[in-house]
């Protein structure tokens, strides 16, 4: 029953689908195992949060700041991360199937072992990212890992 706030503990919470959390500040929140499928979390501050093993199917993170957030093994199938700051996010082992990262900042993101089948990275900054196969993307990588 905790309201959205910085450092809130929503570990393993199961929210109603299509929840509107646009513009919230959840910096440092504990959300491991949370279910926010189909939620609208656009234009939000979710930096330094723990969202590992969470369910974010079709969740909208458009224009959000997720700097240094842990999304290890999260299910982000068809999620929208367009124009978001994802620098230093840990997507290790995450399901990013058909997710969109158009114009997103993925500087030094960790995608080791992630499923990126069908994901869209148009105009995304991939400089310094650790790619799904463990190689490091060159500085200046945009849209593809060079």
Q: What are the residue ranges of the model-derived segments?
A:
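Tandem repeat scaffolds
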Residues: 1-146
């Amino acid at each position: 029953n905790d309201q959205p706030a910085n450092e809130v503990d929503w570990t393993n919470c199961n929210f109603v689908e299509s929840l509107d959390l646009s513009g919230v500040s959840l910096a440092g929140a504990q959300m491991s195992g949370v279910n926010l499928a189909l939620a609208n979390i656009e234009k939000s501050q979710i930096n330094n949060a723990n969202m590992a093993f969470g369910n974010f199917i079709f969740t909208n993170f458009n224009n959000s700041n997720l700097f240094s957030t842990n999304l290890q093994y999260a299910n982000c199938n068809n999620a929208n991360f367009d124009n978001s700051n994802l620098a230093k996010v840990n997507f290790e082992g995450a399901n990013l199937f058909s997710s969109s990262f158009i114009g997103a900042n993925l500087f030094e993101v960790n995608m080791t072992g992630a499923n990126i089948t069908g994901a869209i990275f148009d105009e995304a900054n991939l400089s310094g990212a650790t790619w799904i196969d463990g190689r490091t993307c060159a500085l200046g990588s945009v849209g593809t890992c060079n």
